Amino acid sequence: MKTAILLFTALLLSTSNFAIDNTQHLSAGETSVKEKHASAFSAHSANLKEVKSILKFNGGNKFFEDPWAQSVGSVSSQDGLGPLFNNNACQDCHVRDGRGHASEASVDQRGTDFSTMLLRASKSNITTAEKEAMLNGEQANVADSCIGGQLQHQANFGITKEATQAVSYQYHKVSFADGEKITLRTPIWHVKAIHCDIDDDTVLSARVAPAMIGLGLLALIDEQQIINQEDINDENSDGISGKANKVWSVKTKQVTLGRFGWKAGQPTLRQQSAGAFLGDMGLTTALFQQENCLTQQIECKKAANGNGDMANDYPYEVADKVLDKVTFYSNHLAVPERRNAYTKQVTNGQKIFNEIGCQQCHSASYTTTTSKAFPELSKQTIYPYTDMLLHDMGEALTDFDKNSQTVSGDIPVEFLAQANEWRTPPLWGIGLAQTVDPQATFLHDGRARNILEAVLWHGGEAELSKNKVLQLPKRQRIELLAFLEDL
């Protein structure tokens, strides 16, 4: 209790001159919307006014929401699903454009609900040349020989799916300094491939679908501003050593900054969307032209596809004009305004957030650059609370092997990103996550059932800040959560 009182006193003294920005309720500047209901994440940017642009947004929404069918479907513009896939519609992973959720405990290998999450796979026993290509940003990873780079747990009629998967949980309690306890859960994954055996050196990574809001604004944060926040060797000795991921641009054929995905493995929203079309739904695009069938998956390789033809200007299952609309839609999904930004409880919580060091990774504010393609998103002052960098989040949040055992944290798994590293996720909208989808969970694998659990899973570079939270008195914990829930 003495420690908690000392911390409380220190916070009062150090934050007495804390200044509140009177525009921060507009989390996404002029693009912010006032929505705070179940569809709060589905509105377009508030300043998107041109009828042509709104129609394009609505067109992208249609392709984002509507299910794709197995070839040959009744709607030729939306067939080609699979042969292997995780889901048949973008919206089914990104529920109402929000985040997904972890599966509840499964009683058998059939699993329960894996509709909004997936497992990525990469080998750790690779050649020197392959590792150099990853660390140079020229190659994402080396895929597992049995299930490839992503486990697809569903398949079209007549096709054998790749694997069965299930999850169970182990529970443990964490105590605050005042004696209050909270229960955390650790996922135990049960994965069994059907065609063959998953490689012994394969690293698996569970990924829940993230929220779609504000992505176009994140794309317009100046690259140098992100790079300037790097401190790879922790030269200032503050315990924080963020680094940018360097990834391959399929369009430009060059290495560039990674911005999107749990490990910042994609450079642009267009490439991110095309990657999801292929990996999650088995749909080819001009960027990713080959079906995700491995050599031994004979049924998959022989299956009919939904590719168009050159005469109709779309030789792939997702035409360029469709990818254009989905990308435009993804760029303009708006961030809701904050609801209580200037109340005493929330501003106190914001002071605590800064004092305990959360802002060292969750950088509050940026001004976006100018874009001719996206004028509404240009020159906006935004408050996403992310540095867009990779950070070591500790052993507990490190990726795992096929037996659900944590692997060595320094194994590269996605370009420069290691098994223990995750991009700092933007916090805007987090307080409405369970309004949009009551089942929504938190962190990359959804193990956290609420925001406080997510905070208490922080380790690695965030261990010190997490320990400060454990020392906070009850009232200050409530204030901290009030701030986070207002974002």
Residue ranges of model-derived segments:
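N-terminal signal peptide c-region/cleavage motif recognized by signal peptidases
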Residues: 14-16
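Sec-dependent signal peptide recognition
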Residues: 2-7
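Periplasmic c-type cytochrome electron-transfer domains
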Residues: 18-487
